[in-house]
Amino acid sequence: MAPRPQKKLFTRKKVCRFCADKELVIDYKDVKVLRNFVSERGKIIPRRIVGTCASHQRQLCEAVKRARQIALLPYSGSAQN
């Protein structure tokens, strides 16, 4: 049996949206922006999935944690039974 040919998958390089748009600022009070980086369960989405650079991912984590602490974001997602 001949080996199966490998399919070439084209993966698009993710660009950090904060590096691309210099006017977009990471702020713990801006809940609309922070919700894009938090999963339905309330977990912070990793940078390999979101596509942010390392420095902005660190800033995002700090902002999400601050927003959680002052109750702008929930610690866990909405519990739907």
Curated annotation (Swiss-Prot):
Protein family per UniProt: Belongs to the bacterial ribosomal protein bS18 family.
Superkingdom to which the source organism belongs: Bacteria
Protein name per UniProt: Small ribosomal subunit protein bS18
Quaternary structure, from the entry: Part of the 30S ribosomal subunit. Forms a tight heterodimer with protein bS6.
Keyword annotations of the record: Ribonucleoprotein, Ribosomal protein, RNA-binding, rRNA-binding
Protein function: Binds as a heterodimer with protein bS6 to the central domain of the 16S rRNA, where it helps stabilize the platform of the 30S subunit.
Matching Gene3D superfamilies: Ribosomal protein S18 (4.10.640.10)
Cited SUPFAM superfamilies: Ribosomal protein S18
GO cellular component: cytosolic small ribosomal subunit
Lineage, opening ranks: Bacteria, Pseudomonadati, Thermodesulfobacteriota, Desulfobulbia, Desulfobulbales
PROSITE patterns reported for this sequence: RIBOSOMAL_S18 (PS00057)
Organism in which the protein naturally occurs: Desulfotalea psychrophila (strain LSv54 / DSM 12343)
BP GO annotations: translation
Gene Ontology MF: a single term: small ribosomal subunit rRNA binding
Xref: InterPro entries: Ribosomal_bS18, Ribosomal_bS18_CS, Ribosomal_bS18_sf
